[in-house]
Amino acid sequence: MNRTAPMKQRSVPLSSIMPSEEQSDGFIDLDRLVAAVFRRARLVAAFVVLFIALGAAYLLFATPYYTSMTQILLDENLSKYAEEEPTPVNSQMLDTQIASAVEILKSGELALRVVDKLKLSENDTILNPPRSPVDMVKEWLKTATGLFSGGPDVTEEAARNGRRQKAAAIIQQSLAVERVSRSSVVAVAFRSSDPLLAATIARGYASAYLTDQLNANFEATERASVWLQERLTDLQQRSQAAALEVAHFRAENGLTAARGELMSEQQMADLNSQLIVAQADTASASARYDQYKSIVDQGPENAVKNATISSKEGDNSVIRDLRTRYLTVGKREREVSDNFGADHPQAVSLRAEQEDVARQIYQELQQLTASYKNEYEVAQSREESLRKSIQGIAGKTSDASEQLVQLRELEQKAAALKTLYESYLGRYEQATQQQSFPIAKARVISEAGVPVSPSSPKKTMTLALSAVLGMMVGGAYAAFLEFRERTFRLEGNIRSILGHRSLGYVPLLGTRMKKKAQLVHAHFGSVKRHDEAVDDTMPFQRLSRIVVDAPRSTFAETFRNAKLACDQMLAGSESRVIAIASALPDEGKSIIAANFAALLAASGKRTLLIDADIRKPGLTQMITPAPRTGLVETLIGEASWPAGIKVDQRTKLAILPAGGASHQRHQSNELLASPAMANLIENARNAFDYVVVDLAALAPVVDAKAFAPLADGILFVVEWGRTPSRLVRDLLHSEPLINSKVLGVILNKTDMNELGKYSDFDGAEKYRHRYGKYYVENTITENTAA
């Protein structure tokens, strides 16, 4: 019994010497993006076809609707010859008028007028239009609710009014009113399943709107005329009474004078005019004085900076010249300081000159301030003098003017009443004239015609939108699938995620063969020649001999690569115990174990295949549904292990099944970790060159962990495109012993037709079609067909 310890070099993860995909590039990989697009193109195309089919179904069952449109121009010029002074219209008023017109056209009152004029309350097309399935359900629910709730009897008049209101509500829903761009045109469109009815109602709306405008103008003018006539009668009586009162007051007080006023009043008027001028001069002088005083009060430096002098003043030329010189010197000083430094002699000289000019400007400002102060005091004195003169004259004429004031009050009252009367008289005559001009400020510029083609649904647009929507939904779903891709697709995924060696791809087998493998069992014991026909009742032999029947296939090449990896990494061991494990059930590890063992046996090596998946013995079920003895009976001491071995006469493969029906009563993990199991493995090492053990899945049970110390190496099986990568990574990282004994990972059930779609353009999977001269894939189908 010579046994060499497993080489520790296999426990070194490949991730330590190979960069991961996440570390390779932080930018968007265009190759992967294009590959994803091509990979999901069929899915997106299927969604596009589906949505186009839905769009076509919608077009097939949808009710066609026709739209007829009329255009109304709101033109103020239509009534300008009927108005003496047309009101000018600005853009804001125009927007308001058009908005008001749109709301009037949408109003329920105008809809009722259209219903009454066209008798739409008796039109079945309006009251009972074609309904969608949703509308039919709503109508059914409404009817059912009405049956249970009941209600008072409806009179014929109420029913007629209800139909009228319903027709108005329906045409309001089918009406579309909008302004045409920024023009004064309003477009009125009506939508109906009957093209002739659509044109009729659109015309009816235009006619009803024009009639409404005429009626509104006439009614407003009539109401204004009645009110103006009442006001005119009252104003006429009051104006006559005021005129008589003025005449009587003049005659009683003898108030007659030239130009209708006293001399003292004329003098008072002249003085008042002079006082107004003097007040203006005083205010102007005060403003100038305050301006210069505020500048001077700021000090020399700020006064120079803030000395803003009006160009209309004649005494500021000196200040302007000095200020110009100040700015010029300051500019030169900054240039010299920037070029030669602030301590340069010329810069110092220029700053001194600038300060001197500032002092001169300040002195000039002080002189101007004193001058304007004198002007302000003179103007103030003149204003005070005029006030005193006015007060003196006012005292002399106060007695005479008291009666004149009363007279003027009477005259003003009479004049105001006369002016008001004349104004109302003119408005009354204008309103009377407008009643005889029935002109609306709108006209129809485009008559509604009968549409010849439906406006909805639009076939081309519907199908195009369906295609776009299908592309968007399909693209979103494809992107979701791509972002949710968390499985193993490529050998590079094995290296980057798990840090282990990938042993290759095992192609996906036909479903017909696997279904038979679950329904019937194989028969052993008789030796058959290689050229004999394989019976349909032996699917296990077919599945387990694929590697033998198709030696030049991709399937067989993967197992040869696995054998080579085992021989290299377990070199020095005369007998090797190799476990076959997976993370989840139904990943095909039993078929992998059977073919791997068959390859070893066919190569002339003494090989034992043990089904150690005691809880779910898939390998045993394929061999014989109810074996009498097996692994469990051996471990509990009921039988010896050679008694339970089955031998494949073709490959000379020895197979030890899981056991009989009683194996479910025992704790599988305790059996696999028992001394009896260790003794069995030791005995098997002495009798066989290779011992291949089919273990239970690693995630659901601990059986694989219990057996791991007895294995020299582990071949890990993952299902292509289904096994979650994070699950496998976490399981292996949480079990260092198992992880250290993993010889490599096999990607099982690989769809070889889809494999290249998941690879980069420079990936090895893209060039597998060039390996055809080395492989003969059709032998798998020929030699394993039923």
Swiss-Prot record:
Signal sequence range: none
GO biological process: polysaccharide biosynthetic process
One Gene Ontology term of the molecular function aspect: ATP binding
Coiled-coil region list: none
Periplasmic-side segments: 67-689
Intracellular or extracellular location(s): Cell membrane
Pfam families (alphabetical): CbiA, GNVR, Wzz
Domain of life of the native organism: Bacteria
Transmembrane segments: 43-66, 690-711
Segments on the Cytoplasmic side according to the record's topology features: 1-42, 712-786
GO-annotated cellular components: plasma membrane
Keyword line: ATP-binding, Cell membrane, Exopolysaccharide synthesis, Membrane, Nucleotide-binding, Plasmid, Transmembrane, Transmembrane helix, Transport
Positions contributing to ATP binding: 583-590
Bilayer topology: Multi-pass membrane protein
Cited NCBIfam families: eps_fam (TIGR01007), eps_transp_fam (TIGR01005)
Family: To B.solanacearum EpsB.
Protein name (Swiss-Prot/TrEMBL): Succinoglycan biosynthesis transport protein ExoP
Species assigned in the record: Rhizobium meliloti (strain 1021)
